[in-house]
C-alpha cells in the first residue's frame, strides 16, 4: 500500500515569546519546531511515500529548508494554503490529482493531518492507511474524559447533557481512499460547501461508506499556543 | 457567602507503580498526593467554610491523617462513599442536611468536586460559589479542542458530527444553592434515578434554573492513572 500525506500547516507561524524578550518563529518541543516532529512521524511511516505541505507564503522557504536539512526526503511539495483549512487541503489535492493523472496512478490512500499534531506515531499512521484502504475512510479518535453539554439558548448557561458513552473526540491523520477524497473535495469546491473536517466532507458525498474509528491514546494533541508547550514537553518526554 | 464543599474521592486509591518495583498508594504530583493539592485549593478558597470527603473505607484514616498533618482545618468529615459517585455525594449531603437541620442554617451553596482535579484555583472556587448563589447553579467548563462525533450504530464507525461551537466540556467543582442540591439529590434517591453529574440532576428537578457556565482554561484536568502524571506535573510547574 502507498499513501500520500497532506499536512495542513498554515497555523504554525505563531510567534512564540520566550523569557528575556526573545522570540522564535515556531513553537518548539525538545529543541525542534512542532512541525519537525510531525514531518518526522510521516517520514518514518512505511506506508507513506510522499508528503505535501500547505502553509502560509511566508513559511514556504522555511519549511523547505527544514525538510532538506533534516533529510526528510518524502516532502515533495510545500505550497501556499488557501483562505480556510479546507481550501489548503484542496490546493494539495488538485496538485496530487494533476500530478498523477498523466501516469494514471493515484496512491491507494490520501491522509490529511494537522501540522500541529506532532505526536502521532509512525505505526499509527500505517494502521490508518491500511484501515482507510480497507474501509474507505478511517479517522483517529478517543473518548472524551469530561462530560459534554450543549451551550444553551442563553449562551451564558448550559443546555442538554450529551450521552458521553456515545461520543468520540476526533483527530488527524484522517485517511481515505484517494479517489473518494479527491471526488468529495471536488464536489465541495463546486458547491462552495465547507465541512468541519475531511471526514464530514466524505460522509456527505459518500454516505454509504461509514468512517472507521481508530482509537488512539491521549498523546495525539494539537499544539497551537505557548500555553500548550509544557504539556507537550511532558508528552514528548513520556513517548521517548 | 459561605459554602460547603463535597469532595468525591473514592477513586484516589489506585496504586501507582514506580520505577524499581516500588509502589505508592496515591498518585503524586510535586511530591504530594493529588488529593492533597485538591484539599489545599479548597482550604485557600475564602468562601468555603467546611469540606466533606467521601472515600473508600480503606482510605478514611489516611485522609484524616493527611488533613491533620497538612493543617487543613476545613476538613470536617471523611466518610465512606457509596456504590456510585452519586451515592457518595448523597451520603455527604445527608450528613450536611442532618447536621444543619437543628440550627436551621444551611450554607449558601454546596460545591461538589472530583478529588482527582487538583488544579482548580482558590479564586475559581470562590467565583463558582458566588455565581451559584446568584444563579442557582454554576459549573466550570471549557471548549472542546477536537471535533466531537457520535459513535455510529455500527460501533466501529463514526456517526454524525456535532457542531463544536455549541459544545462545552464540563468539569467540577459544580456549585448549587444548598437547598436546590439537597432537594434534587433527595428526589433522585427516592426515584432511584442516576445522572451523569450533579448539574444534570439539578436540571431535572429544577428545569427553570439554567446552570450558569463558568469558563476556565485547560488546567482543571482529572488525574486518574499514572499515564496522566507527566502532563499533570507540567501543568503543576506552569501554575506555580
UniProtKB/Swiss-Prot annotation, chains A, B:
It comes from the Bacteria. GO terms for biological process: isopentenyl diphosphate biosynthetic process, methylerythritol 4-phosphate pathway. The keyword Nucleotidyltransferase applies. Keywords: Isoprene biosynthesis, Nucleotidyltransferase, Transferase. Pathway: Isoprenoid biosynthesis; isopentenyl diphosphate biosynthesis via DXP pathway; isopentenyl diphosphate from 1-deoxy-D-xylulose 5-phosphate: step 2/6. One of its GO terms (molecular function) is 2-C-methyl-D-erythritol 4-phosphate cytidylyltransferase activity. Belongs to the IspD/TarI cytidylyltransferase family. IspD subfamily. This is 2-C-methyl-D-erythritol 4-phosphate cytidylyltransferase. It comes from Chlorobium luteolum (strain DSM 273 / BCRC 81028 / 2530) (Pelodictyon luteolum). The lineage of its organism: Bacteria, Pseudomonadati, Chlorobiota, Chlorobiia, Chlorobiales.
